[in-house]
Amino acid sequence: MIIRLAGMSVRQGCLLGLLMCALMMGVALVLQYVYGLTPCPLCIGQRIAVLLAAFVFAIGALHNPAGNLGRGLYAGLAALASVLGLAVAARHVWLQSLPPENVPSCGPGLDYMMEVLPLWDVLSRVLAGSGECAEIHGSLLGMSIPQWTLLGFAVLLLIPLGMLAGIVIRRR
């Protein structure tokens, strides 16, 4: 699969990445607005990572650089956003796997923290997760929503890795 992605143009790779981001955000919004699942702080962090990757992919698709420098830049930034989302999703899955007595207690709401605390403190508390992040709200095919999101970020990461592989293959 990586080799097939390596043969794509920057625009094709970025459009594929953008499509994957749209799919991930679409599912998140359906879960929120159709099924009434309120996103926890880690879910919001994952959404931010998807939006960052989507932004990079959109700019890359519009720019469509011909050289390896542009290809590497967009692929590297998209990979960074994907790894960020992967890390937040992994943290979320880990929190859900904890025994109930080890789950962190619920803290103040995100809106309140944004009003009262400096941004860095809010980010560190959000990424630490809380009790609400450990709740499992159903599953599909035996996997929780954060597990599916983790899988989504892993698939998303393949796209910029394929774009980076294209640089290596072209240099041979």
UniProtKB/Swiss-Prot annotation:
Source organism, top-level taxon: Bacteria
Ranges in the topological domain labelled Cytoplasmic: 1-13, 66-72, 167-172
A Pfam family matched in the record: DsbB
Periplasmic compartment residues: 31-48, 91-147
Disulfide bonds: C40-C43, C106-C133
Membrane topology term: Multi-pass membrane protein
Keyword field: Cell inner membrane, Cell membrane, Chaperone, Disulfide bond, Electron transport, Membrane, Oxidoreductase, Redox-active center, Transmembrane, Transmembrane helix, Transport
Bilayer-spanning residue ranges: 14-30, 49-65, 73-90, 148-166
Any GO MF annotation of the entry: electron transfer activity
Compartment list: Cell inner membrane
GO cellular component annotations of the record: plasma membrane
Gene3D superfamilies hit by this protein: DsbB-like (1.20.1550.10)
Family: Belongs to the DsbB family.
Record's function text: Required for disulfide bond formation in some periplasmic proteins. Acts by oxidizing the DsbA protein.
Protein name: Disulfide bond formation protein B
Source organism of this protein record: Chromohalobacter salexigens (strain ATCC BAA-138 / DSM 3043 / CIP 106854 / NCIMB 13768 / 1H11)
Name of the coding gene: dsbB
